[in-house]
Regions:
Chain B
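Conserved glycine-rich phosphate/nucleotide-binding loop
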Residues: 11, 17-20, 132, 141, ...
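Short acidic (Asp/Glu) and glycine-rich catalytic loops that position anionic groups and cofactors
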Residues: 20-26, 173-177, 223-229
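N-terminal basic/disordered segments at the start of proteins
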Residues: 1-39
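Glycine-rich anion/phosphate-binding loop at the beta-strand->alpha-helix junction
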Residues: 90-186, 190-193
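Short, surface-exposed beta-strand/loop "edge" segments at domain boundaries and coil↔beta transitions
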Residues: 23, 34, 144-148, 171, ...
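Alpha/propeptide regions of enzymes that mature by internal proteolysis
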Residues: 2-5, 32-120, 186-274, 283-290
């Protein structure tokens, strides 16, 4: 090295840079950047192999070997259930690990009749996405509506679940099938969501959303507070006893099943007097009405701004002047109190002191509204091929629970059926586990953990088994120096 | 002690040479013995490629007019390819990928008797075609979308031996917004630098939909220094797409006229232009013989 370079070295190290020794370029890498190869980066002043435990994408059947690092040590080695008899293997451990790792962006495929392709990326395909559960009954958009990010379609509104709206984002078609820009937008959104960062989405013909794993969703600029305690009918059932003495009638307004206390089984059992109330919508069974309101962003997550819109004139034969009516949403966040006048018209009044606790009780029994994100991906043939001579044995071994699959050390649910398609709660995966290649494809960790005995029985490459201590020494020596945790 | 160059075979039998940021995918056709000789020769040559470049890296990252005279053959290829364009900012690094491909393909082709050979360095391809053979290069409309939109057939009569693609979203930074600019030229180094420069010119200048960032903010050692490179491209109108392509086409035509390239394809948001001896209508699943 010439002298002037040594001077440069001292100056650059001062700025928090690290020097990579992985190849002769010996890049100085600034904090939060990668070297010229994109394989090594400066993470908090520590030279770090940027490849996660393995690359989770389908590399096509050909040329698909990827050699991961065995352990994302700094993030999760304390959590993983590793015993001395257990080997942790990444996929592709049969190649000349650890020195040889074809970068994901050069993994090549053959096209029929074409020798080679003039593109930075050759034939990478990605099979992954996220399922998003947004705890809200607010209408965020019709089912099947496109979900847009950066103006590009990245998924759609899926079928609603209990107290929540569901989004299905990503998947191979959005990542690779529509346009380059939609693929990139999809990739960026998936990576951000998996890394538990906030992402802005727009539902076509619906709401704007800001969602982040483990936090309250923001819908049209308003942060959602509570998940409803149950449908309107269920709410009536739960709180009937508390209402019995303080009001004469309660309507729990709900887009699915609106409950009416005195008609409801719960009110009847308590011997409550029929109020003569008439609701729009369709009566299903006593006290349970469908189609009363539509989902929306108005009163209590419905399309109405005034609850009186759903009432028809009271039946004069049953109703009486002075009747006390409570109308409340399923989360208790919207509540109004009325008293009938001599003409049996409901007159709005402040919530009486003895009614307020019953409304608060609904909110108290609601859970906080959260966004939860499950990453779903499939480990195809190439991912398994590096692990054993017969990939199918690995699949069977996973089915038999002899081989445990984890994602960044987090437990996964394996889908029944073919392949190794798993789902993982991104909040359980260590930060920094997810990345991308510009293909676009998402990079995520996956580990197969199996006993040595079973590993060899699988046809695993015995020679490739390395002692954990060797792996740590060889791959993470800088981490060991920097992270006191491991020297204790 | 830094890591050494790695030579390995992909499962389809192609040779993969990797060292630091360089990844080469190589395929030779011919007798098994000749292929083996060529692969050995190329792998051997590759062992020192990165070390040679690193020795002169400081100079090669300067504007080409200020670069020292190069010692290594690859560095010389880089300078020769880039100094033709002394009327605008360019460093020899703009030709590094193509120059490595040219050097390796030259070694392989002269080491034994092959029918055809290509060296693909991240999309910058150097090739040689024997009599009666052809090399088919797939054409894409984006550097990050491998869907083929056409094929280029090169025969032994072709006077071109290099194809390179550049654009926004690839590994290199660009001043422009092209999805892909593919250039066909006499060698990969020439194609490489031309693709880079044309892609730089597929541009709308300062534009609200185009976000830029200083190159050395995203890569501290970038040869582009604090020049502004594209970081994202938003929605563009049809007219804006055509205007940006016009700007690139003008640059590509000038290169064709000067004879530094044979032809180019420029792609942006589904619009494709061609410059050279072929027509765009040949593009979609068409066959452009050369």
């Amino acid at each position: 090295m010439p002298d002037h370079d040594l001077n440069v070295e001292e100056e650059q190290i001062d700025e928090g840079k690290v020097r990579c020794e992985a190849c002769p370029i010996r890049c100085f890498i600034k904090p939060e950047q990668t070297g010229s190869c994109d394989r090594y980066g400066n993470v908090d002043g520590v030279l770090t192999r940027m490849d996660p435990v393995t690359v989770l994408h389908i590399t096509n059947k050909r040329g698909g070997s990827v050699v991961p690092f065995a352990l994302n040590a700094e993030s999760w080695s304390g959590e993983a259930s590793i015993s001395p008899e257990v080997v942790i293997i990444g996929s592709g451990s049969g190649t000349t690990y650890p020195d040889y790792k074809p970068a994901p962006f050069i993994v090549s495929s053959l096209h029929d009749g074409v020798d080679t392709v003039t593109v930075v990326t050759e034939g990478i395909f990605s099979y992954c996405g996220v399922k998003v559960k947004i705890d809200t009954d607010r209408h965020i958009g019709d089912e099947r509506s496109l979900v847009m990010h950066e103006g590009e379609p990245i998924g759609h509104v899926s079928t609603a679940e209990y107290g929540s709206q569901m989004l299905s984002l990503g998947g191979v078609h959005h990542l690779t099938g529509i346009t380059k820009h939609s693929g990139l937008a999809t990739m960026r959104a998936l990576e951000e969501l998996c890394e538990k960062r906030a992402v802005e989405l727009q539902v076509e013909g619906g709401a704007s959303l800001i969602i982040q794993a483990g936090t309250a969703p923001v819908i049209n600029g308003v942060e959602e507070q509570l998940m409803r305690v149950g449908c309107g009918s269920a709410s009536v059932g739960m709180f009937a006893g508390q209402w019995q003495d303080v009001v004469d009638e309660v309507v729990v307004v709900d887009e699915h099943i609106t409950g009416v206390l005195t008609e409801h089984q719960a009110g009847a059992v308590l011997g409550m007097r029929p109020s003569g109330i008439k609701l729009r919508g369709r009566r299903s069974t006593p006290g349970r009405y469908f189609n009363v309101v539509e989902p929306g962003i108005g009163w209590g997550g419905t399309n109405i701004s005034d609850p009186l819109e759903i009432l028809q004139p009271f039946k004069p034969k049953l109703a009486w002047p002075g009747l006390r009516l409570l109308m409340v949403s399923t989360t208790g966040d919207a509540a109004e109190y009325f008293v009938l006048n001599d003409k049996l018209e409901p007159i709005r009044q402040p919530l009486p002191d003895d009614v307020i606790p019953t409304v608060e009780q609904i909110g108290f029994n609601c859970e906080p509204a959260l966004t939860s994100i499950v990453f779903m991906a499939g480990a195809g043939g190439s991912l398994r091929a590096g692990t054993t001579n017969s990939p199918i044995r690995l699949t069977k071994s996973v089915r038999n629970a002899q081989t445990i699959v984890t994602c960044g050390g987090a437990p996964v649910y394996i889908w029944p059926g073919g392949g190794i398609t798993f789902m993982v709660d991104v909040e359980k995966v260590p930060p920094g586990s997810f990345g991308h290649v510009p293909t676009p494809a998402i990079v995520a960790p996956i580990e197969f953990t199996v006993s040595r005995e079973n590993f060899i029985a699988l046809g695993g490459h015995e020679k490739s088994i390395r002692q954990m201590s060797d792996v740590l020494l060889a791959e993470r020596v800088r981490h060991l120096e920097h992270k006191e945790f491991y020297t204790q | 002690m830094t890591g050494a160059a790695v030579s390995a075979f992909l499962s389809d039998g192609r040779l993969h040479l990797q060292h630091g940021p360089i990844d080469l995918i190589i395929e030779a056709h011919g007798d098994a013995k000749d292929i083996s000789i060529a692969y050995d020769a190329m792998a051997k040559r590759f062992e020192t490629v990165l070390d040679e470049l690193v020795l002169e890296l400081t100079s090669l990252r300067r504007e080409v007019s200020k670069a020292d005279s190069a010692k290594s053959p690859i560095a010389r290829r880089m300078i020769v390819a880039t100094e033709k364009y002394n009327d605008e900012f360019v460093t020899p690094m703009a030709a590094v990928a193509g120059s490595v491909a040219d050097e390796i393909v030259q070694i392989g082709w002269t080491s034994s008797s092959l029918k055809k050979l290509y060296v693909n360095n991240g999309g910058d391809i150097a090739f040689r075609v024997g009599s009666g053979e052809e090399v088919v290069v797939g054409l894409t409309k984006s550097v990050i979308d491998p869907t083929l939109i056409g094929r280029l057939h090169f025969s032994s009569k072709s006077n071109v031996c290099g194809v390179a693609t550049s654009g926004f979203g690839g590994r290199s930074r660009t001043f422009g917004i092209a999805d892909a600019v593919t250039v066909i030229s006499s060698c990969a180094a020439d194609a490489d630098v031309a693709a880079t420069l044309i892609a730089n010119h597929v541009s709308l200048g300062s534009h609200p939909q185009v976000k830029v960032v200083a190159a050395n903010l995203v890569d501290a050692t970038s040869d582009l220094g604090d020049r502004l490179v594209t970081s994202s491209v938003g929605n563009l109108t049809k007219q804006e797409i055509e205007t940006a392509l016009d700007n690139g086409v003008e640059k590509a035509r000038a290169m064709c006229t000067r004879g530094t390239i044979e032809g180019a394809f420029l792609a942006l948001r589904g619009s494709v232009r061609s410059v050279g001896k072929f027509h765009c209508s040949y593009l979609v699943d068409g066959k452009v013989s050369w």
